[in-house]
Amino acid sequence: MTVKTRFAPSPTGYLHVGGARTALYSWLFAKNQGGEFVLRIEDTDLERNSQEAVDAIIEGMHWMGMEWDEGPYYQSKRFDRYNEVVDQLLAEDKAYKCYASKELLDEIRAEQEANKEMARYDANHPKIVAANAAAKEGDACVIRFRNPKEGSVVFDDQIRGRIEISNSQLDDLIIRRTDGAPTYNFVVVVDDWDMGITQVIRGEDHINNTPRQINIYEALGAPVPMFAHCAMILGDDGAKLSKRHGAVSVMQYRDEGYLPNALNNYLVRLGWSHGDQEIFSQEEMINLFSLSAVSKSASAFNTDKLLWLNNHYIKSSEPEYVAKYLQWHLDQKEISLDNGPAITEVIKLVGERCNTLIELAEQSRYFYQDFEEFEAGAAKKHLRGVAKGPLELALAKVEALEEWTTENLHNVIEEVCAELEIGMGKIGMPLRVAVTGGGQSPSVDAVMQLVGKERVVARIKMALAFIAEREANA
């Protein structure tokens, strides 16, 4: 039997990190087992759904690299199928019409609470029996599933172990509302049955739904999938993860300069482990992932750890991979690569210094765009009269260079130091400020090589003009 998992988000908002981790676990399990992964959009809540949310979910899945084998399926396009199954259950007396109004049910619930009884629907309650008896054909009604009254629902959760719920704790679930809309617990059963889902991996907030769904599977004679319920994700303060803990949308992490490999690596470790290993390639995740190694306990989201991983992936990934995701940030900052070095060479040079792609994009700017002024602090410290002679000599030497290589530029700097009998800092720092506009960069000879001869010459002249003006105004 082919293993088949699914991710089934509701399009009422963005793809948040909890949902992204669930999707990742489902995707990894399917790939580990040589199975298939299905994307299903659970859009039966027509009032709250939005196409914008659907687009955001699909964009987030693509960005994370979780491609699906089937789908996306949309529940809103399957209402005929749901009605067909409702009719089947009605015909087999496994479901029935209920005419009790919301007001009547609220009244009964209040009585139960006043009597310190468990508030639940009871088909045999005299008032409900009377309401059903008084109903006429065509009156508004819901359809309820006839839940077994005896015995228990038992299932082996692949993360939490054996779970048992008495049927006496479960009431007769509404499977179709008065407006004809099917309900969540019903449609997911029909979908998972029709789509051949073998493993349902989802958040622990669905544990209470599982026994209800299992009873519907069994009433339909459908195979019951295996279930695995993941613990929740907490903020670093121990509270449930929310917006106040920082970014919670997958695409917000994209916007803040994270690589998908870094986020995937972080999310897979947020509840799953393989010894002490922290860094996992996608291939390793697929080969090593197992539900038995997923923790039952909640995990705390640590932004500093994610940032550390992001820096690791910026430094260690192939430059072409980083460039693919850097491009979006370059576009946001209106940095065109048309007039400058290959971006992969810039990534090799400055990537190690960057924690995010936002930083990398900003530190790439001076390779492609000229600046009109120097950073005030760096210029005040390093573009002084004492730097005039070293910069003039360096300018003459770089203008005379026939081969524009890092080695030759390094030799120029050493020659200036030797001829003027000055330390490396006396020319290195003024050159750095002149060429980059600021006081921090990788090795200045490597930077100059990538910036290019024409720009380096022009920027040294600009620095000398700045020094001359500064001395004139002193």
From Swiss-Prot:
Catalyzes the attachment of glutamate to tRNA(Glu) in a two-step reaction: glutamate is first activated by ATP to form Glu-AMP and then transferred to the acceptor end of tRNA(Glu). Belongs to the class-I aminoacyl-tRNA synthetase family. Glutamate--tRNA ligase type 1 subfamily. It comes from the Bacteria. Gene3D superfamilies: 1.10.10.350, HUPs. The lineage of its organism: Bacteria, Pseudomonadati, Pseudomonadota, Gammaproteobacteria, Vibrionales. Monomer. It is found in: Cytoplasm. It is an enzyme of class 6 (ligase). Its EC number is 6.1.1.17. The gene is gltX. One of its GO terms (biological process) is glutamyl-tRNA aminoacylation. A motif ('KMSKS' region) lies at residues 240-244. A motif ('HIGH' region) lies at residues 9-19. Keywords: Aminoacyl-tRNA synthetase, ATP-binding, Cytoplasm, Ligase, Nucleotide-binding, Protein biosynthesis. One of its GO terms (molecular function) is ATP binding. One of its GO terms (cellular component) is cytosol. It catalyses: tRNA(Glu) + L-glutamate + ATP = L-glutamyl-tRNA(Glu) + AMP + diphosphate. ATP binds at K243. This is Glutamate--tRNA ligase. InterPro entries: aa-tRNA-synth_I_cd-bd, aa-tRNA-synth_I_codon-bd_sub2, aa-tRNA-synth_I_CS, aa_tRNA-synth_I_cd-bd_sf, Glu-tRNA-ligase_bac/mito, Glu/Gln-tRNA-synth, Glu/Gln-tRNA-synth_Ib_cat-dom, GluQ/Sye.
